Regions:
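Conserved P-loop NTPase nucleotide-binding/switch module
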Residues: 229-288, 293
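Conserved lysine of the Walker
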Residues: 162
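Conserved P-loop NTPase
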Residues: 113, 118-121, 286-305
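Hydrophobic anchor at the beta1->P-loop junction of P-loop NTPases
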Residues: 154
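Hydrophobic positions on the alpha1 helix immediately C-terminal to the Walker A/P-loop
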Residues: 165, 169
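P-loop NTPase switch/communication element
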Residues: 174-223
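N-terminal accessory targeting/assembly segments
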Residues: 1-100, 175
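P-loop NTP-binding catalytic core
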Residues: 84-149
Length: 305
């Protein structure tokens, strides 16, 4: 992503903030805006900016000013367009998706309803993720589609770039390249981080031939896509449960290719995970991409499974 585009995404995210914090965010140096990953607002404490250097105060001029609960309420109103009722379901799951595809994680007091659902009130903190589109990132991955695309698993630690790479691969498969035809891609976007759907429209580029199930658990969404969208590829973010593997195995048995991510610090940790052992035993994936970071740069390694 070009620096100007990265700064532009920062400014879009900053526009969601309460007015006094918007002003502080705009005074951040340009190079830091380009590196920013998250705004973090915690009631009773100053707002911080997460970068590769860690959490930093947004402004030295406001070191003792604290985020108030009114600030957090204003943020939620701005993101939902003053229609929290319409966003109650995702808010109860701990997040909101704003215009532009920005995901806002929320903490507060949780009330468990009789039907097992949850509601969130008395918001105590919010994390505004500055999602970025890095186009052409797939070209840095060695031989990920050599001989044609095959089912691929991406592994990296939290914040290691899995979702960004996954999104670019989805768009690339969906749009096609000079030497590859476009494929129909189905995405189960359980937490709204891949497509950033806002009122039914993807705010992030996931390709021209992509169908998205938003806010749906992977184990439910994968068979739904098989029935409704006739995909050639199904993509999901963050495999966490055995039920996810069962659904992906069923899709693979129907001839569908899979593209997914999983948390792991490195290949050694990945191979110790029971979920990974289940995946290899099921034979769902044919390629593994691991992402590591050294000296501020990400490195990609591809191997056969």
């Amino acid at each position: 992503m070009e620096i100007g585009e990265a700064v532009g995404r920062y400014e879009q995210a900053a526009a969601l903030l309460p007015s006094r914090w918007q002003q502080a965010a705009r005074r951040v140096p340009e190079h830091r805006k380009a590196q920013a990953e998250e705004f973090r607002l915690r009631a009773g404490r100053p707002m911080t900016l997460l970068t590769c250097e860690g959490e930093l105060l947004v402004s030295d001029e406001l070191p003792r000013q604290s985020v108030t609960q009114a600030d957090l309420e204003q943020l939620c109103d701005a993101v939902t367009g003053y229609s929290r009722y319409a966003a109650a379901e995702t808010m109860g799951k701990g997040y909101l998706i704003g215009r532009g595809g920005f995901r806002i994680g929320l903490c507060g007091t949780v009330a468990v309803r009789g039907d097992g659902g949850t509601a969130l009130r008395d918001i105590s903190s919010a994390v505004v993720r500055i999602s970025r589109q890095i186009r052409g990132l797939w070209q840095e991955v060695p031989e990920w589609s050599a001989g044609g695309f095959d089912s691929t698993l991406i592994a990296a630690p939290p914040g290691g770039g899995k979702t960004t790479l996954l999104r670019d691969m989805i768009a690339t498969l969906s749009n096609g390249t000079e030497d590859r035809c476009p494929l129909r891609v189905g995405v189960v976007d359980e937490r709204g981080e891949l497509a950033g759907m806002y009122r039914g429209v993807p705010q992030l580029d996931v390709g021209c031939h992509t169908d998205v199930l938003d806010g749906c658990p992977k184990a439910l969404g994968i068979p739904m896509l098989l029935r409704s969208a006739n995909p050639q590829v199904i993509a999901v973010d963050e495999i966490t449960e055995a039920a996810d593997i069962l659904a992906m195995t069923a899709a693979a048995n129907c001839g569908v290719k899979l593209l997914a991510t999983i948390h792991a610090e490195d290949g050694e940790e990945l191979r110790r995970k029971p979920l990974f052992r289940q995946l290899t035993e099921a034979g769902v994936f044919r390629r593994l991409i691991t992402i590591s970071t050294a000296e501020g740069r990400r490195h990609y390694r591809t191997e056969a499974l």
